[in-house]
């Protein structure tokens, strides 16, 4: 209890005693009245009342323009404007408005996407003496039209992009589109000749703007505020919130909410800069937009603030929160990083009536100090009666900020403000009374017990609610529902919180009149609907989606036998909310099923299956025989779990059956009883080839693993996935290797180590290595002793570095861990390193569950292991899969999205975007969201590439195979397949998606053939498998609740949530574009990892917007045709045209060849070494420039003769080429002649290639490249291995880089001479062949301090280069600052010594970055003394604000390459 509360209660106690002694018959209610002292205290909190401010905000903006004409006023995504431009452009537009219609006080709607021109339009209307109504184009057209009709708009100002929409919603108005071109004349030489009109003086009493909110009549309610009413609140409010002349203010709020008016006018009136991101970035990349625009002040709801990256807060001077309650934990957390402000204010009393500018100062949140007003608390049932401090009352706002008029329609305006009640006119014993306007807010609050007069929010009194930050009048929803239902229907809309937790939900309670008053025999309050009423509900739901925003459409319709009523005969809403808390989310799903006919399961299998559905989806009795598994919340992940649940129940069901028969009745017909036979055992060495005996297999694989032959426990083939992953690791050393670290108490770490070893004994995959057996291919070898522990260490950074450098290669352990304990520490760093060839996202939790159980002394028994899956793969007839893929990919379109910048380009992802796609809660679809995403992406690709035939890759779980117990197999089973989709724009969307779904099911038996095997089937297959886009879908995992991490420490190594798991998948991206979609109950998050050289970031942002639009269209109107949604806007179409191959654009009339076309292959193809030598010799012999000699020319076409042929053979021999005159005569081209030149190394490679690729040597010549012949990563590894056996030393990288067999043979080294081993740790070694180019003198010239001593130089990676540029260039987005507060004084000299020692001991902290031509290099220094500054905080300064100011100075200071 606070001191103020104690004193108040003591005074109340004394007054009650006095009253009892003086009048024992007094009523108890009399003690609830405000005492004289309390009334005096209330008046002291509300006195004096700020006088009305009699000027207009646009006058303040004009003053700023006069003071700072060239200062940037608006920094927007679509351009910048100076204060001079804002002033001149708004004046020019105001004169235009006057010329078109000179009447004062008319209301002019304003319709813009987020843009620099919105502020100009608003100021122009203010200067013209009119009243503006801001609209958001994202709102439904029906709502926009209702607003425009209310204001009887004659003029309508819009952006150029929204002019068409403006014309639709206001057909009778004159549309004035605003864009840059409109103001070209303002600074032109003929500007003086333009017609002008004198702008009228604007009175502070004139209307400034009208703000629309939910209305109880079903129409939006309009509230008009005058200039003086707004200014009287904005001026004191802006100072408290934190608007300063140096502020860079985020323009975040939707134009539908009045907060955006403050963002514009308060910013410009204070000489600050308004930062306006695009709508797309505002919704999908707010943190990135704020970084790019260097925002220092932002206003938003707490829900949005929680989505910001942590470092964003560090760069803000203030963050203003409003629109919904702020939690104490959020306030405390954010308050450590920036100044947190809490604002409250209904539209009827301007944007903010109270401001708490020190939110983090208390363990609870108040609404803050009054600004431009007084605040009173009255009895909710009697507005004339004040409540005493501490009691809950309705908040009333008094003062000049209270609006005068409300509900503006074509009829007479209605006054809504109240006069101060007579009981208040007299004031108190210390304060005189007064007259004024008052607004009843409907909010229930109480005063802060500290006695400072600040209110604390308690709740809402009326039907106005807040849901996810949106202000909703329930009556508006009820009105719109009632229009489409029978007139005698009783209904009430409420926000409930269903039992079982989770988010609040908007629902509608309904009583069908024919059943009113009936009651179920068991007393159940829930009723039912007749068939006719259900039909009416279906039609109403469709109409609500047109009339109302999505957040105002109920998510469920709950039938009641009788509507609960109060004594007053009003709806008992409290009782409805109580009923809502008894409803589960399964109940809501059941209530929502009224739109479909219910049929009870009847057969034994249907009843059993319903039980399984219930366990998996919740609510066993909810499901009818015609319910669709996917409509009820099922997806591919739950389909696999259903298979497992069925097996536990003694039933056999497989995933394809579920996908093809999604209704409960159809699915039940596919179920079979599980046979009694136990799972067949798979003996060791039983899966290898028959001509490879066990002893030979053990001996060969043991040698390749470097272990004793007795250590080999089993050998079996690799999956195609494993082969591909190992091949990519050979190309990129750290590809597909994950490294994770957990810091644990040393005792826990030691127990966990023992648990790992125990788990390895029972899990063969942890003891598995992969080897390449010459002549046989890749095999996995299971060892008896996995030896997972790599080593101990004392320096975490050093261990991690060395661990990364130790490649996970053929023959090495693919899962290992290390323990690192620093000296004197009682904690241990537990590091695990694992290769994707032994785990995937499904098996990883299984492995760590085994480890956790071992940690707790429990055994784990699994009925199947990875080799059971291998047995299944080896039992398949490969011919069936080959026929399927050969037919599936026949005639495929060779152009894929996104295109490569040039032929042979190797992609490397360097950019990442995220975009959330909301799925309407009212959308019911009988297909999975995964199918919709596949179909939508296929249409997006088709639109951009201009072709109805598209291909992209998809990575699947691979656990749809018919293997008993497949869901508990510990091992990687994911697989990637080419998804080919052919589109017809005349086809209905529902039919198209059904075809995509059917294709997905049909490919299940063939999905494990492997990309490297599919590509060898045909030329078309090879083209299709050169995948540019990879798609990964992450279904939402069920929430298992809180877990005791001390009992399951291995879970520390698992991704924290679905989003983190998705981000981990992105680390393994080898595509030009990888899309990872994380699905949840409200939609899905797209994470796009891409190579910006293939598609720019801006273009990719627009692609994701197109994807969002198409998914929404698919769900919103599945019966429309594909062509109806296959539309690109002008900017998107421009992107598509730039990407599209020229010969695909048949309507363009351009006949040039595509960049990838075979017509240009010969011209673009690099010459082989033999061709280069022939060209040089022929140029000499024939006396012609080499540039005129083409590989397609023959010797005689170039003018050669027999003598020339003899000279050619002779000169060729001098250059090491073995050639005969007969070959010269027989060759039809120089390319063919060069290919016919033989050498021993090339012949060896020819033999190997013929064997690996399975094609005759006669079909291979020296000008062919390995990949043109159908080679892939796996083949490259086999080629290197077999070449080494033939005495040729090659690397996988050389195979990838060589353009022809001849070039590859030239680069191969004979292994007769001993190989010299290079020291990879030597200085400059990381630069490879370029090391000689970078001498210390050359690098030293770039350093800021020439005295620094260079230790090493290394190249940087693309993302590292991006971070460096983000430090050197403005705006800076790669800097990080940490503010550490010490509780007690410290030795400052020792602190500096410690900082310098930290730098000296860590190589990365001693690294600076220089730029040599276009390359960014990391330069490791010996022991530089880094800058260290001590800055004293002036007396009276706030240390946080002072620190932020110094941080901002440092951000703006130059940071050139070569500096520390």
Curated annotation (Swiss-Prot):
Q: Name one GO biological process term.
A: amino acid activation for nonribosomal peptide biosynthetic process
Annotated region Condensation: where? 712-1135
Name of a matching Pfam family? Condensation
Q: Origin, by domain of life?
A: Eukaryota
Composition-biased stretches (Polar residues): 1313-1322
Query: EC number(s) of the enzyme?
Result: 6.3.2.-
List the GO molecular function terms: ligase activity; phosphopantetheine binding
Q: Kindly state which keywords UniProt assigns to this record, in alphabetical order.
A: Ligase, Multifunctional enzyme, Phosphopantetheine, Phosphoprotein
Region of interest: Disordered: 1303-1324
The protein's annotated pathway: Siderophore biosynthesis
Induction info: Expression is up-regulated under iron depletion.
Task: Reply yes or no: does the keyword Methyltransferase apply.
Answer: no
Please give an example of a GO cellular component term from this record.
cytoplasm
Residues of the region (Adenylation) are: 63-468
Which top class of enzyme applies to this chain?
A: ligase
Which Gene3D superfamilies does the record associate with it?
A: 3.30.300.30, ACP-like, Chloramphenicol acetyltransferase-like domain, N-terminal domain of ligase-like, Nonribosomal peptide synthetase, condensation domain
**InterPro entries on file:** ACP-like_sf, AMP-bd_C_sf, AMP-binding_CS, AMP-dep_synth/lig_dom, ANL_N_sf, CAT-like_dom_sf, Condensatn, PKS_PP-bd
Q: Which stretches make up the Carrier domain?
A: 600-675, 1168-1241, 1236-1312
Q: Which residues carry this modification: O-(pantetheine 4'-phosphoryl)serine?
A: 636, 1202, 1273
Reported consequences of knocking out the gene: Leads to increased sensitivity to oxidative stress and raduces the virulence toward Arabidopsis thaliana plants.
Query: What's the stated role of this polypeptide?
Result: NRPS involved in extracellular coprogen-type siderophores biosynthesis. The role of extracellular siderophores in fungal virulence to plants is to supply iron to the fungus during plant infection, but not to act as phytotoxins, depriving their hosts of iron.
Protein family: Belongs to the NRP synthetase family.
**Comment field on protein domains:** NRP synthetases are composed of discrete domains (adenylation (A), thiolation (T) or peptidyl carrier protein (PCP) and condensation (C) domains) which when grouped together are referred to as a single module. Each module is responsible for the recognition (via the A domain) and incorporation of a single amino acid into the growing peptide product. Thus, an NRP synthetase is generally composed of one or more modules and can terminate in a thioesterase domain (TE) that releases the newly synthesized peptide from the enzyme.
Descriptive protein name: Nonribosomal peptide synthetase 6
Give the organism, scientific name: Alternaria brassicicola (Dark leaf spot agent)
């Amino acid at each position: 209890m606070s001191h103020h509360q104690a004193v108040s209660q003591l005074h109340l106690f004394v007054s009650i005693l006095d009253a009892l002694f003086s009048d024992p018959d007094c009523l108890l209610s009399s003690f609830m009245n405000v005492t004289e002292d309390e009334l005096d205290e209330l008046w002291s909190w509300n006195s004096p009342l700020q006088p009305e401010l009699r000027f207009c905000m646009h006058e303040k903006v004009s003053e700023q323009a006069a003071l700072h004409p060239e200062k940037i006023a608006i920094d927007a995504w679509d351009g910048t404007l100076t204060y001079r431009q804002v002033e001149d452009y708004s004046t020019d537009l105001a004169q235009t408005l006057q010329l078109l219609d000179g009447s004062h006080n008319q209301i002019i709607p304003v319709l813009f996407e987020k843009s620099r021109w919105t502020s100009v339009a608003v100021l122009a209307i203010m200067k013209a003496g009119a009243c503006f109504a801001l609209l958001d184009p994202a709102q439904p057209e029906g709502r926009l039209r209702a607003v425009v009709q209310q204001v009887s708009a004659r003029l309508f100002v819009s952006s150029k992009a929204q002019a068409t929409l403006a014309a639709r919603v206001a057909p009778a108005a004159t549309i004035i589109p605003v864009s840059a071109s409109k103001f070209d004349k303002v600074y032109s030489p003929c500007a003086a000749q333009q017609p002008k009109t004198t702008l009228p003086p604007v009175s502070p009493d004139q209307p400034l703007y009208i703000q629309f909110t939910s209305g109880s009549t079903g129409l939006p309610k309009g509230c008009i505020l005058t200039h003086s009413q707004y200014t009287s609140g904005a001026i004191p409010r802006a100072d408290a919130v934190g608007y300063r002349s140096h502020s860079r203010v985020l323009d975040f709020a939707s134009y539908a909410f009045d907060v955006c008016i403050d963002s514009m006018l308060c910013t410009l009136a204070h000489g600050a800069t308004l930062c306006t991101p695009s709508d797309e970035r505002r919704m999908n990349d707010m943190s990135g937009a704020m970084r790019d625009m260097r925002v220092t002040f932002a206003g938003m709801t707490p829900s949005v603030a929680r989505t910001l990256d942590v470092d964003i807060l560090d760069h803000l001077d203030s963050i203003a929160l409003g629109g919904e309650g702020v939690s104490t934990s959020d306030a405390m957390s954010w308050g450590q990083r920036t100044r947190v402000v809490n604002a409250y204010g209904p539209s009827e009393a301007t944007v903010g009536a109270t401001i708490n500018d020190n939110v983090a100062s208390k363990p609870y949140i108040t609404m803050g100090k009054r600004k431009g007003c007084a605040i009173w608390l009255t009895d909710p049932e009697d507005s004339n009666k004040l409540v005493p401090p501490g009691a809950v009352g309705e908040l009333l706002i008094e003062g000049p900020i209270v609006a005068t008029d409300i509900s503006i329609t074509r009829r007479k305006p209605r006054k809504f403000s109240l006069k101060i009640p007579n009981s208040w006119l007299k004031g108190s014993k210390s304060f005189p009374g007064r007259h004024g306007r008052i607004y009843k807010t409907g909010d229930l609050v109480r005063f802060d017990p500290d006695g400072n007069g600040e209110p604390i929010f308690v709740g809402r009194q009326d039907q106005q609610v807040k849901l996810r930050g949106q202000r909703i009048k329930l009556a508006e929803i009820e009105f719109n529902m009632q229009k489409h239902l029978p007139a005698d229907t009783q209904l009430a809309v409420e926000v409930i919180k269903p039992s079982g937790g989770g988010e609040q939900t908007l629902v509608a309670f309904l009583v069908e009149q024919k059943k009113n008053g009936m009651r179920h025999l068991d007393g159940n309050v829930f009723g039912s609907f007749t068939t006719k009423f259900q039909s009416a509900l279906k039609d109403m739901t469709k109409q609500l989606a047109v009339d109302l925003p999505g957040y105002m459409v109920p998510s469920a319709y709950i039938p009641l036998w009788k509507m609960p009523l109060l004594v007053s005969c009003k709806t008992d809403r409290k009782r409805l909310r109580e009923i809502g808390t008894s409803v589960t989310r399964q109940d809501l799903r059941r209530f929502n099923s009224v739109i479909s006919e219910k049929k009870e399961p009847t057969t034994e299998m249907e009843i059993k299956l319903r039980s399984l559905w219930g366990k998996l989806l919740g609510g066993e009795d909810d499901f009818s025989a015609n319910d669709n598994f996917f409509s009820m919340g099922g997806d591919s992940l739950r389909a696999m779990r259903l298979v497992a649940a069925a097996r536990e129940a003694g039933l056999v069901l497989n995933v394809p059956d579920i996908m093809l028969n999604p209704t409960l009745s159809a699915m039940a017909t596919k179920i079979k009883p599980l046979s009694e036979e136990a799972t067949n055992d798979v003996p060791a060495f039983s899966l290898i080839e028959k001509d490879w005996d066990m002893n030979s297999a053990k001996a060969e694989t043991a040698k390749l693993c470097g272990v004793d032959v007795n250590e080999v426990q089993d050998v079996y083939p690799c999956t195609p996935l494993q082969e591909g992953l190992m091949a990519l690791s050979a190309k990129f050393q750290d590809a597909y290797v994950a490294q994770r670290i957990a810091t644990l108490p040393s005792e826990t770490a030691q127990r966990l180590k023992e648990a790992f070893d125990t788990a390895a004994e029972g899990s063969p995959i942890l003891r598995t290595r992969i080897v390449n057996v010459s002549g046989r291919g890749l095999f996995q070898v299971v060892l008896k002793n996995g030896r997972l522990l790599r080593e101990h260490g004392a320096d975490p950074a050093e261990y991690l570095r060395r661990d990364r450098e130790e490649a996970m290669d053929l023959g090495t352990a693919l899962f290992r861990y290390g323990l690192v304990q620093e000296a004197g520490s009682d904690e241990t760093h537990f590091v695990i390193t694992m290769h994707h060839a032994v785990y995937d996202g499904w098996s990883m939790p299984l492995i760590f569950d085994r480890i956790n159980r071992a940690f707790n002394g429990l055994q784990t028994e699994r009925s199947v292991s990875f080799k059971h899956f291998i047995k299944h793969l080896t039992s398949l007839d490969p011919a069936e899969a080959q026929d399927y893929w050969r037919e599936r990919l026949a005639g495929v379109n060779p152009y894929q999205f996104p295109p490569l910048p040039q032929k042979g380009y190797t992609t490397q992802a360097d950019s990442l975007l995220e975009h959330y796609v909301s799925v309407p809660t009212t959308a019911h679809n009988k297909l999975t969201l995964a199918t919709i995403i596949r179909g939508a992406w296929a249409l997006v690709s088709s639109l951009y590439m201009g072709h109805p035939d598209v291909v992209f890759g998809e990575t699947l779980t691979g656990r749809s195979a018919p293997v008993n117990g497949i869901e508990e197999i510990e091992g990687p089973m994911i697989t990637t397949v080419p998804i080919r989709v052919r589109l017809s724009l005349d086809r209905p969307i529902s039919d198209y998606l059904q075809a995509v779904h059917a294709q997905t099911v049909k490919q299940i038996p063939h999905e494990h053939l492997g990309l490297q095997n599919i590509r060898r089937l045909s030329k078309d297959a090879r083209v299709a498998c050169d995948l540019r886009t990879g798609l990964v879908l992450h279904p939402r995992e069920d929430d298992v609740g809180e877990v005791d991490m001390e009992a399951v420490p291995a879970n520390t190594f698992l991704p924290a949530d679905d989003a983190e798991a998705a981000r981990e998948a992105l680390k393994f991206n080898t595509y030009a574009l990888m899309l990872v979609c994380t699905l949840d109950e409200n939609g899905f998050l797209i994470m796009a990892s891409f190579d910006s050289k293939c598609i720019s970031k801006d273009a990719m942002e627009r692609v994701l917007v197109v994807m969002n639009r198409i998914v929404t269209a698919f769900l919103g109107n599945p019966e429309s045709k594909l062509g109806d949604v296959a539309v690109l806007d002008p900017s998107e179409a421009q992107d598509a045209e730039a990407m599209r191959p020229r010969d695909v654009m048949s309507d363009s009339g351009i006949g040039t060849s595509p960049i990838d076309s075979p017509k240009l292959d010969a011209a673009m193809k690099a010459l082989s070494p033999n061709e280069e030598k022939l060209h040089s010799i022929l140029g000499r012999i024939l006396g012609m420039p080499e540039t005129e000699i083409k590989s397609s020319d023959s010797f005689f076409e170039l003018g050669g003769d027999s003598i020339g042929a003899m000279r050619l053979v002779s000169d060729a021999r001098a250059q090491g080429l073995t050639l005969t005159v007969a070959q010269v005569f027989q060759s039809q081209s120089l390319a063919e002649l060069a290919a016919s030149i033989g050498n021993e190394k090339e012949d060896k490679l020819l033999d190997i290639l013929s064997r690996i690729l399975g094609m005759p040597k006669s079909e291979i010549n020296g000008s062919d490249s390995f990949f043109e012949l159908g080679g892939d990563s796996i083949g490259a590894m086999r080629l290197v291995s077999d070449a080494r056996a033939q005495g040729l030393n090659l690397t996988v990288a050389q195979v990838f880089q060589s353009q022809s067999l001849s070039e590859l043979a030239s680069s191969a080294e004979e292994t007769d001479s001993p190989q010299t081993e290079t020291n990879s740790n030597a200085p400059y070694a990381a630069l490879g062949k370029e090391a000689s180019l970078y001498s210390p003198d050359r690098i030293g010239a770039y350093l800021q301090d020439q005295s620094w001593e260079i230790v090493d130089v290394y190249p940087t990676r693309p993302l590292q280069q991006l971070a460096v540029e983000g430090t050197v260039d403005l705006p800076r987005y790669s800097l990080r600052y940490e503010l550490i507060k010490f509780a007690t004084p410290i030795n400052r000299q020792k602190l500096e010594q410690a900082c310098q020692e930290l730098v000296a001991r860590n190589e990365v902290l001693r690294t600076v970055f220089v730029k040599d031509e276009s390359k960014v290099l990391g330069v490791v220094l010996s022991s530089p003394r880094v800058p260290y500054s001590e800055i004293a905080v002036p007396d009276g300064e706030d240390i946080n604000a002072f620190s932020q100011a110094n941080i901002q100075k440092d951000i703006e200071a130059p940071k050139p390459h070569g500096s520390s």
